């Protein structure tokens, strides 16, 4: 048996490349698209089977885009070459999304939610994201600032405003998730917001809003008159 089962060894009607050319990329499954990137399987599985195992081992596409080289290479059938192919693909997508951000203007909380809801709502730990805006409320950048249990003693305004100054932001919005799915603000959430609001006034970089993301829903502290 060949050490690496290639795409052209899969029955012609099941080959991802041929399906893409004939039907279009939108007709392929996630596993088939990844198979085209990886090109070969291994001695135990063809490339489509390997792609299926990779995607499902990391918890779907969201997990794939967050996986490190070490985590990928711990999967059966994934060595350095395939791990770097996956990481390069993910990085290209991330850069594309960043280039899209600069076209977005924020006028209401739902505009912000569109940027972060899918990313944050399914996470198992709290993550704080900073959105930097220019003088016209257009997005300059979106950055993950903190990961872990959020409380007012751990989230330091210095880390947030350092990134805002670096990007020449005129104003900022922060967002974080509640893994419980309930976006009701905690006392720590309110304390963090108050501290950042006061620091923003001193630095001339206004905190416009703080969004808390739950399970497919969100709360804006601005709309709740907490900010």
UniProtKB/Swiss-Prot annotation:
What keywords were assigned to this record? Hydrolase, Metal-binding, Metalloprotease, Protease, Zinc
Please give the InterPro entries that the UniProt record associates with this protein.
MPN, RadC_JAB, RuvA_2-like, UPF0758, UPF0758_CS, UPF0758_N
Listed binding positions for Zn(2+) are 176, 178, 189
Q: What sequence ranges are listed for the domain MPN?
A: 105-227
State the span of motif (JAMM motif). 176-189
Q: Name one GO biological process term.
A: proteolysis
Supply one GO molecular-function term: metal ion binding
Carries keyword Iron? no
Instruction: Give the family this protein belongs to, as stated in its UniProt record.
Output: Belongs to the UPF0758 family.
What this protein is called in its record is UPF0758 protein CPR_2111
- Organism (species): Clostridium perfringens (strain SM101 / Type A)
Organism phylogeny: Bacteria, Bacillati, Bacillota, Clostridia, Eubacteriales
């Amino acid at each position: 048996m060949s050490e690496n089962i290639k795409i052209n060894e899969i029955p012609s009607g099941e080959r991802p490349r041929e399906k893409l050319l004939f039907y279009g990329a939108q007709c392929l499954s996630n596993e088939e698209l990844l198979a085209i990137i990886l090109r070969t399987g291994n001695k135990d599985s063809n490339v489509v089977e390997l792609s299926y195992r990779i995607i499902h081992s990391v918890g779907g596409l969201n997990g794939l885009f967050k996986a490190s080289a070490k985590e990928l290479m711990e999967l059966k059938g994934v060595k350095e070459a395939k791990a770097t192919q996956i990481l390069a693909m993910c990085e290209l997508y991330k850069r594309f999304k960043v280039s899209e951000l600069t076209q977005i203007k924020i006028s209401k909380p739902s505009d912000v939610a569109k940027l972060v809801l899918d990313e944050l709502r399914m996470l198992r730990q709290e993550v704080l994201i900073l959105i930097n805006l220019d003088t016209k409320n257009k997005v300059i950048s979106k950055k993950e600032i903190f990961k872990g249990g959020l409380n007012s003693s751990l989230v330091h305004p210095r880390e947030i405003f350092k990134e805002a100054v670096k990007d020449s932001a005129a104003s900022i919005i922060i967002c974080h998730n509640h893994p419980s799915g309930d976006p009701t603000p905690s006392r720590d959430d309110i304390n963090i917001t108050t501290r950042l609001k006061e620091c923003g006034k001193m630095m001339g970089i206004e905190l416009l809003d703080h969004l808390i993301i739950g399970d497919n829903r969100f709360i804006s502290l601005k709309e709740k008159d907490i900010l």
